[in-house]
Amino acid sequence: MKHKLRSAMLLCVGLLAIAAISIGTSKAANPDETVDIIGGYQLKTYSKIYASGISAESGTTHGGGGSCNVSATFYALDTDDNVIYTVTGSDTYNYYAIVNHSVKDAAHDYFYKAESVHHITYNGNNHTYYQTADYP
């Protein structure tokens, strides 16, 4: 009985060790795998995000503690072009789909039909938006 219990415990510990190694390896091997979006969604870098109707001028920065005063609609799409998340509104930094550009600064790798780039600085954080002229 003791032998079976010990074997089961060793097997369990071994499986946990293998799982921990594979999780650590996959994270290290794919540091750019996901893009964080406020709202709790994580998109693969090959997914598409549409941002239309951004009201700030290209290159405009807003510093300090105030609102960015950006109005936009963001469409997060899966790889089959199905909309999985849509948000519309202003003060995008606080409420809506912000791309964490530090994950992968070449944002056009996962933005679709990017026609203009917007850099918004809010509380010292620089965020990059790609605006699309139309929703497909």
Predicted regions: what they are:
Residues 1-51:
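N-terminal prepro-regions of secreted/extracellular proteins
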Residues 29-136:
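Mature secreted bioactive peptide module from preproproteins
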